[in-house]
Amino acid sequence: MSCPRAVHSAATIGNHLLFAGGYNSTTGKYLSTVESYDASLTRSTAVELSSAKNGLASATVGEYAMFAGGYKGNSDAAYVATVDAYNTALTKTTMPDLSVGRYGLASAVIGDYALFAGGISKISSTADKYQDVVDVYSA
């Protein structure tokens, strides 16, 4: 990888494996980079996420690898609702937002649907909320 990272997410699309976002403890920065490895393990960089974040979830359904939610720092706007999607050509598309910005959410695919469930969001300057919401995206 191009830098140390943790709390990132991974997905496959076509002949590509993507690692997205995360946190670099060496620099103390959240990451927006998306690194791609092809079937011959050649590394390249895809178009960046819409914002630097960690704690995001990923799922691949149909033509898209999706990276949803995340956390981007200590502020009221730190809980991200954005869903960035990459096709087999590694072209980025932004999908409709999650219903609630959150991080630490889980993801799974069933049939033609990607589900993003749970996670943590902010309800006040001193309190987090554990979510029971499930957002569904179709192929």
Predicted regions and their residues:
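Kelch-like beta-propeller repeat domains
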Residues: 1-139
